[in-house]
Amino acid sequence: REAIGEHAIFFENDDGRIVLLLPYFDNVIVGTTDIRVDQPEVCCTQEEITYLLEMVGHIFPHIEVAPSHILYTFSGVRPLPTDNSKQSMGQITRDHQNKIVEQTEYSFPIFNLVGGKWTTFRAFAEQVTDQALKFLGQSRCCDTKDLVIGGGNDYPFTDREHWIASVAENYQVDSKIVKKLFDRYGTGARAVIKHMSEPLLSRTDQWGKNELNDLDPFDQKKPLGNVADYYVGEVRFIAEQEKVVFVEDFIRRRSNLAMLGQDTPQLRAELTEIMADLLPS
């Protein structure tokens, strides 16, 4: 982690594949690989792990990196257009496109959305919506070009400390907690803290005196017993607002706990107790 500092390292391998090293808290994210697959269920293979570790060794030959240093691996499936003329998967375009099939057995065309990524999903959605509106003979009545996503709304770019101090005073919460949640959720931290400041009186009968890991189940400002960076009320807020169905949803898809290597059986048990009444039965 010290070797890259706060810089991202980007280079292209001889086979055309891109390799990235990104600082992530006290760790480093290393990626990526491109393998053609036919099934929706995938995992990071030993071959890919070996390849990426070798690439790191090329850039930092003086640093020993072993599989035992890996905290977390992730694999996803990205739909790309068929292009048999390319020698490697890395050479296939990532640009988004909507292939419209006009002649179908139905009374409407079929839109086939291919490619794209997180950085272009809003633009892609706008283009497809315009195409759909044109087919329906309708015109656009609004757009989201200037709509800020999530915690970027009303972000205090020049007065961050004042924002933190103000929220801490309004909700009688330690400013260190506010700062931590602000770093995690941006201005969305205000809603999280508001929720954390509310009592859990409705849970008296369910919790009783069976306190989990010595946590007070009625104090939502209490940190978790297994991960002190997260709080009881925060977990419940995310579980409710982000429509968590399984505990794993929170660990892997609503937080960075898995990526930081903090996914343990003890944590899962604790989270299950905290959000049990919010999960679908």
What are the language-model segments listed below?
Residues 1-30, 34-213, 217-263, 267-280:
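C-terminal catalytic lobe of FAD-dependent flavoproteins
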